[in-house]
């Protein structure tokens, strides 16, 4: 399974408190709710616990509340992941294979839903702290349960728009995602979140 799948099945600060700060939760919720749709390009870098690069990819994404997302990773590790709000389709053109599964609405299992899902559930799922410097607001999210894809997630905003995301897993592997060309609240066609599986492709239902 490719490392890119860690983010979407398709994104730490050290000063933490034991419980979510109400002001930090409210601020993060406001920033997220302001963007009903998001489009952006991204570059993703994954490092192991010692800092060795494991993978570097680029691509583009489109998100829309509630629960809709399109995430395309460019070649050579090309993949497309699309959610219609109920199910997620992962298309691997190299394998000519489509994997279809029910959308896991838990924010700790599907980080993309932090940007496209029900933000009212954030404080139920995470302890949250915020830090602001140089016009950038960093939110650190620590899952409240152990059954998660990551141990820590940092979400950063610049000028009111998401700027980057970092996930750290239990073995110290880091996935850093930088978003560029971010645009919010532009009209997105419904067809963006529907994936037509090519004829003859292998289909796996999970």
From Swiss-Prot:
Species: Pseudomonas fluorescens (strain Pf0-1)
SUPFAM superfamilies: Prokaryotic lipoproteins and lipoprotein localization factors
The UniProt record lists the keyword Protein transport: yes
GO CC term (a single one): outer membrane-bounded periplasmic space
GO BP annotation list: lipoprotein localization to outer membrane; lipoprotein transport
Subunit record text: Monomer.
Keywords recorded for this protein, A-Z: Chaperone, Periplasm, Protein transport, Signal, Transport
InterPro entries per the UniProt record, alphabetical: LolA/LolB/LppX, OM_lipoprot_carrier_LolA-like, OM_lipoprot_carrier_LolA_Pbac
The UniProt record lists the keyword Protein transport: yes
Family named by the database record: Belongs to the LolA family.
Protein task: Participates in the translocation of lipoproteins from the inner membrane to the outer membrane. Only forms a complex with a lipoprotein if the residue after the N-terminal Cys is not an aspartate (The Asp acts as a targeting signal to indicate that the lipoprotein should stay in the inner membrane).
Signal sequence region: 1-20
Name the record gives this protein: Outer-membrane lipoprotein carrier protein
């Amino acid at each position: 399974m490719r490392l890119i799948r860690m983010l979407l099945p398709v994104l730490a600060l050290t000063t933490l408190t034991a419980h979510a700060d109400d002001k930090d939760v409210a601020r993060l919720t406001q920033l997220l709710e302001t963007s009903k749709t998001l489009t952006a390009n991204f570059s993703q870098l994954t490092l192991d616990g010692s800092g060795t690069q494991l993978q570097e990819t680029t691509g583009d994404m489109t998100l829309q509340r509630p629960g809709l997302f399109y995430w395309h990773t460019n070649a050579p590790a090309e993949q497309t992941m699309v959610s219609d709000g109920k199910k997620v389709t992962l298309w691997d053109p190299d394998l000519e294979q489509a994997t279809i599964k029910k959308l896991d609405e838990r924010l700790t299992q599907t980080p993309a839903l932090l940007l496209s899902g029900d933000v009212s559930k954030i404080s139920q799922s995470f302890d949250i702290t915020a830090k602001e410097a140089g016009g950038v607001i960093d939110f650190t999210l620590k899952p409240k349960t152990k059954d998660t894809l990551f141990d820590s997630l940092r979400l950063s905003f610049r000028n009111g728009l998401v700027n980057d995301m970092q996930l750290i897993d239990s073995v110290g592997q880091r996935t850093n995602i930088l978003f560029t060309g971010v645009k919010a609240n532009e009209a997105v066609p419904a067809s963006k979140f529907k994936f037509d599986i090519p004829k003859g492709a292998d289909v796996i239902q999970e």
